[in-house]
Amino acid sequence: MMMALYSIAPASTPELEIAALQKELAGLPAGERIAFWAERFVGTPYDEYPLGEYVRKNVVVADERVDCMYLTFRTVELALGTDPGDSRRIALHLRFLHRGMVENGRVVNYEDRFQYGEDMIESGKWGREITSEIGENSTVTGPSGKSATFVPAGLISQSPGSFRSGDIVFFVNPPEKMAGGVIVGHIGIIKKETDKIYLIHASGKKERGGSVKKVLLGDYLSIMPFEGIKVTRFPADVQMPE
């Protein structure tokens, strides 16, 4: 498939164009579609609102500003949907511990949303965990007693076969930062290009700003403040429930 290079974030993209792109991408594996949509958000401003703009407005789509969790939500929804409406339907499944509910065009139960990356992993909704395939695993236990198995930063394999486009990377906090038992401190998405592995992530801080960036994974690993990573992967032909 010949694919044009798109770099305009969906926030400025009419739904008809999104629908056309979704149709064009339909034959690609899920991971390739996820990476494609993630890259379209590069340059999008970071969402500085503490709970997220989408939660504040009680909406499904709020593409003008994104944080790492919304970027993950929206990228996967666009990748797995057959059209914009289908992506919104998928959002009500993927973003929630149970299922989202919409009344009069507004989400009415965002208190049921995933708020922690570790819960996304454990739910099984966000792909199969492949942490053990990325490198030698270790275990960390925070002050609350909650523990997590992960790949330490220095043991993460960056061989050509380790990651695939569309893999979701959950960055594990060091024990001293696991306040309240929060294991995952950041989330990003992998994009592979020949022999290079990139991380696409919403780089910023609440109330300080930032933007979505695409960086070499190795470069980010060398400076990141996290202990290591956990990784999930969707099957190539993933099917969403009705």
Where are these regions (language model features)?
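Low-complexity, Gly/Ser/Thr/Pro-rich intrinsically disordered linker/tail segments
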Residues: 165-168, 174, 185, 190-242
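A mid-sequence, solvent-exposed acidic-amphipathic segment
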Residues: 137-178
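Generic detector of short, locally flexible boundary/turn motifs and exposed helical patches
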Residues: 37-38, 72, 134-136, 153-156, ...
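Short amphipathic alpha-helix initiation/capping segments at coil-to-helix junctions
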Residues: 65, 162, 177-184, 192
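Mature, folded catalytic cores of secreted/periplasmic enzymes
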Residues: 9, 15, 20-23, 29-35, ...
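Short, exposed beta-strand "edge-strand" segments with a Pro/Gly-rich flavor and a Y/T-containing core
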Residues: 7-11, 26-28, 143-155, 206-217
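N-terminal capping segments
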Residues: 8-141, 146, 179-180
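Bacterial N-terminal signal peptides
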Residues: 1-6
